Amino acid sequence: VRSRGLGDVYKRQGLFLSSGVVRNPDYTMERLVRVAKDLRQVYRFNGYIHLKSIPGASRELVNEAGLYADRLSVNVEIPKEENLKLLAPEKDHKSVFAPMKYIQQGVLESKEERQKFRHAPRFAPAGQSTQVIVGATSESDKDILFLSSALYGRPTMKRVYYSGYVSVNTYDKRLPALKQPPLVRENRLYQADWLLRFYQFKVDEIVDDAYPDLAPEIAPKLS
């Protein structure tokens, strides 16, 4: 981390550490952990760190990351595994849900230890989050919200983020050629997500088999 860049970090009091996979998941994750560790121990950075875990990374590296990051995330990206395989045959949901499990166990074990020992190390005290890509594959809003609801049933999952698919690859026919990201749909999903998290709505109270997608012209709470 360059000193000038670190100065900018201090001004913002928070940062997001992320990377595409280089060589393999563990190699990439090890480098992310090293940056987070240096920020804490060498540069004495006490601000907020959100570290995006790499799917397929080892439990040991995820556990180490949680000692330096306030929040960890592993992105689901595509809700249905068959659609994930269609776009990225080398990926599967196991590589995503395994690190999620490691994070959950680390957070819960840390809380238990800190109840017994005041100075026990914290582990990702802000919990974990994930992201779903909207519009790249055939999932309905109902499919996406059922996944979100299941994830919120896990005690350490704090947020599911929704990101409208942006078409940047026109030659790959597996991907839809959208003229613009589905921003209205993305916004409706966030509104429905709010109902799930804060008002304890059930998914089938928002969408159902007859109407599996949120109405673009009306907010979910009014539909």
Positions of predicted regions on the chain:
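Single conserved hydrophobic/aromatic residue that forms the stacking wall/gate
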Residues: 1-10
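Short, flexible active-site-proximal loops enriched in glycine and acidic residues
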Residues: 11-16
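Conserved AdoMet/S-adenosylmethionine-binding subsite of the radical SAM
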Residues: 23-207
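Conserved alpha/beta core segments of nucleic-acid transaction machinery
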Residues: 209-223
